[in-house]
């Protein structure tokens, strides 16, 4: 039996799981699911090669849930993921698949969460743990997590964990697991380091390779925008700049559908939310309004939008980036129908660049970046639309009835020129969307590769003084990874944001040098960051984060004695330890070397 005529019932899965799948809308297994489930349900090891978006989460979650012991309240299933976003996604999938199974508890463990909350959740006895290597290793060392009863281990996106430098931590964790467990390893590629792990820890694994069937959509113009500032403000700008018949905005959660819809309604857009909490009758009414033009914008989750087919949709906005490429293809496929052209826009946070690369790789395309629509352009657009509305009223038959009201609008019976009166009425009529759009107040800190400008002692080229005079709310830190280590800005931003629970929007300029890098972070973190990142590694190298200068420094950095120690490629940190400097009559003690007895990984 091929996967095209199989159902999930064909695998002999627990009836409660089948019921949950039916509720979600899962009918037919994907190729990776059809290939993996029969082996995993029998307790066999599986080595799977499949692209992100192939449905591999269900491929391992469903058979492992089938074999779980509901009456045993200890960790039985462990899933390792490279990022906290993926950990949350996988944990949610387990919860959705097991919602009809009484007594199943799922817990996601990742950096950035408070330990006390995680300990409280661990004491409740979750059977399924999903987490990132660094935080899981911390719990193992603290003896707050026991894997002695584990029977199933999953390494999800193993090649990504290798690229991010987590493989040593993964191997350490695997040595803590009983030999009798089964292992499922999934990876888009199969480098030698991953092969070595499979040979060392897996028992005669069944190797399964699934080719991606994701195709490009030449009829859809695709672009992405790197997020900075408030996403809702940016969303309004993109909607105003685009001529569309109907738009669908994809978000990740039910709450987000309501929040975004509320914002759009406030700005005068005819929009509605579509989520899993809606009953079938209300859902059908909403879709009917979208089809006949009574509704222009729909804010939906992936699950709620299943089966959505409306020819009017000409614009798709991925407000929250999907976690896999298949979901992205399904989303943008809502436009460009019936021979029409369509447009798709993707909002990408700095920490989500990896997901963008996965989408581009799976679709074999390069998605172009766009800028936020400019203020002058938006002002022009708003004025044009407002002028159209004014013209409609000028052509109305009852306009003469309102002419008689004009004299009554003049305050205190004073004479008022008609232009001032019209301007006042215009200001009142503009509503939430001002006809005069203010210039952008948020300047995007672009995370670009910057050449090592310290060569030939050209210190002034970095202009630290002007930078810090501009922004008093950031401190400058140094980390011990640079271009010679193969590091890129995305690696640094991802690690800092992921482990430090720092929004990527709050990360300032990142500068790459030969043997180290500098990064701007919000002011006031210098006492906590060394402990937070004590074991953090990027590309398998400890970052050893150190405070260089804080925003309270008043002097001219170019006047500091021996500043070449910072600026030359031959950084002599030993000489700089606890050294005192004098600048503008103010003595500053700058500690540049932080002793790290323990280390911590993302």
Swiss-Prot record:
GO terms for cellular component: cytosol; ribosome. A motif (Q motif) lies at residues 6-34. SMART domains: DEXDc, HELICc. Pfam families: DbpA, DEAD, DeaD_dimer, Helicase_C. It is found in: Cytoplasm. It is an enzyme of class 3 (hydrolase). The keyword Endoplasmic reticulum does not apply. Residues 37-208 form the Helicase ATP-binding domain. A motif (DEAD box) lies at residues 156-159. InterPro entries: CsdA_RRM (IPR034415), DbpA/CsdA_RNA-bd_dom (IPR005580), DEAD/DEAH_box_helicase_dom (IPR011545), DEAD_box_RNA_helicases (IPR050547), DEAD_helicase_DeaD (IPR028618), Helicase_ATP-bd (IPR014001), Helicase_C-like (IPR001650), Nucleotide-bd_a/b_plait_sf (IPR012677). DEAD-box RNA helicase involved in various cellular processes at low temperature, including ribosome biogenesis, mRNA degradation and translation initiation. Belongs to the DEAD box helicase family. DeaD/CsdA subfamily. This is ATP-dependent RNA helicase DeaD. It comes from Buchnera aphidicola subsp. Baizongia pistaciae (strain Bp).
